A protein has these predicted regions:
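Conserved PLP-enzyme active-site core in the AAT-like
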Residues: 2, 6, 34, 58-190
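N-terminal amphipathic/basic leader segments beginning at the initiator methionine
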Residues: 1-19
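Short, charge-rich amphipathic segments
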Residues: 13-25, 44-51, 74-78, 132, ...
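Conserved N-terminal alpha-helix of the aminotransferase class I/II PLP-enzyme fold
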Residues: 15-62, 85-91
Length: 190
């Protein structure tokens, strides 16, 4: 069992019952721009938010295929089912996983995680899960990143599927390079 999608508020359900509008019309463009603006405010980000017509899994795949290639190495820090899933998605690129497994139900220890990353400078990417949906553990992403060197550090990709909109998540401020999330959990949308 995993939580989600969430129950939608009546106002969202009512809005979804309205007639569709064309994706090439001005009204759609205005709504889309407003959604991008509001997501940027939610994330406190000046970096453009890219909206994908996919699930959270599709967003994670997008991160993996755009930052990893066959022969690359990446660090996967996992404390549950969805951390493992992000790892498997990344491995499909042909990249090699260097794994740090945390006991399921426990969060990432800041010092151990930072030390592990520093021990593997050959790794191009670091995969982290902000909120591990399978256990409800929130990982200290901000604190981990703050202790990594600013230069010569891996690209940091974060699974925020069940955290964004529910708990604080400020990727630009924290130093996250890529964040994947979906609308059906903390954003309370279809």
């Amino acid at each position: 069992f995993t939580p989600g999608p969430v129950e939608l508020p009546d106002r969202v359900l009512s809005s979804a019952a309205k007639p569709l509008i064309g994706h090439r019309c001005r009204e759609f463009s205005e709504i889309f721009a407003e959604i991008e603006r509001k997501l940027s405010l939610l994330l406190k980000s000046e970096v453009p938010v890219i909206i994908l017509p996919s699930s959270g899994t599709g967003a994670l795949e997008c991160l993996a295929v755009n930052f990893l290639s066959k022969g690359d190495k990446f660090i996967s820090v996992s404390c549950g089912v969805f951390g493992n899933r992000f790892r498997e998605i990344a491995k499909r690129t042909g990249a090699e996983a260097v794994c740090m497994d945390v006991t399921m139900g426990e969060g990432c220890d800041i010092d151990k995680t930072v030390s592990f990353v520093k021990e593997h400078p050959e790794c191009k990417v670091l995969l982290l899960t902000h909120n591990e949906t399978s256990t409800g553990v929130v990982n200290p992403i901000k604190e981990i990143i703050s202790l990594l060197p600013k230069e010569n550090r891996p690209i940091i990709l974060v699974d925020g599927v069940s955290s964004v909109g529910a708990i604080e998540c400020y990727p630009q401020e924290w130093g996250v390079d890529g964040l994947a999330f979906a609308s059906q959990k903390g954003i309370l949308c279809p």
